[in-house]
Amino acid sequence: MMNRIHAVILDWAGTTVDFGSFAPTQIFVEAFRQAFDVEITLAEARVPMGLGKWQHIEALGKLPAVDARWQAKFSRSMSAADIDAIYAAFMPLQIAKVVDFSSPIAGVIDTIAALRAEGIKIGSCSGYPRAVMERLVPAAAGHGYCPDHWVATDDLAAGGRPGPWMALQNVIALGIDAVAHCVKVDDAAPGISEGLNAGMWTVGLAVSGNEFGATWDAYQTMSKEDVAVRREHAASKLYAAGAHYVVDSLADLPEVIAHINARLAQGERP
């Protein structure tokens, strides 16, 4: 069957590993503190999630509340040199900590096996730079998650998200003949934009990732009402970014792919 999904391109933190996407958020808070003794909140740290990490720090500096704190302390806005300094603090912290957040999210291993049984290739890309991915990839493999290909945010001269380049590099590496036969899966808006810009179907994850922003343990004990409110908040952001589908976690992906395959068979395209 030619007219079906041939590849999925998966994000990492909050999508396949690190439920709630905590590895990067906590490190941003620590890097701001370490480099300039400026406090940011976890909620603020989550706002630009999905961008490359230098661009993420730049976006944090432009948040009105963070800019106000910066102005109060330094009588100016954040500069490129400031971003470099925070990034320099961020990198060793992230490299050291990322292995602690490398366990696959519940359902990921079984889902990957089911997709591979259907002949679907598993691509991946991340807002993490290569130095971090070189630690994360083998750690995740040790836990049983090993995609067919991965691309880091600083691998390509053209750049990272929300541009299409990391997703398209997966298409090239995996030998996929049509972007309409690919699905980009992500828990943050820039990754949905990436998939759309690459001409792919896009699936947002509303519970496992950054926008929901809870640990697995917290999620397990959360009231149904709280889950519903958080899910709606996350889903609305992902749909606003243009996601074709939004589900809770990667475990829900096979059902979505069956739906997309039916649409492809009828001649639909993303």
Curated annotation (Swiss-Prot):
Keyword Magnesium set for record: yes
Cofactor note: Binds 1 Mg(2+) ion per subunit.
Gene3D superfamilies, per the entry: HAD superfamily/HAD-like, Putative phosphatase, domain 2
Keyword Metal-binding: yes
InterPro entries, alphabetized: HAD-like_hydrolase_sf, HAD-like_sf, HAD-SF_hydro_IA, HAD_sf, PGP-like_dom2, Phosphonoacetald_hydro
Gene Ontology BP term (one): organic phosphonate catabolic process
EC annotation from Swiss-Prot or TrEMBL: 3.11.1.1
Residues binding Mg(2+): 11, 13, 187
Cofactor: Mg(2+)
GO CC, alphabetical: cytosol
Residues forming the catalytic site: 11, 53
Record keywords: Hydrolase, Magnesium, Metal-binding, Schiff base
Alphabetized GO MF terms: magnesium ion binding; phosphoglycolate phosphatase activity; phosphonoacetaldehyde hydrolase activity
UniProt catalytic activity: phosphonoacetaldehyde + H2O = acetaldehyde + phosphate + H(+)
Assembly and interaction partners: Homodimer.
Family listed: Belongs to the HAD-like hydrolase superfamily. PhnX family.
Role summary: Involved in phosphonate degradation.
NCBIfam families associated with the record: HAD-SF-IA-v3, phosphonatase
Protein name, as recorded: Phosphonoacetaldehyde hydrolase
Species of provenance: Salmonella paratyphi C (strain RKS4594)
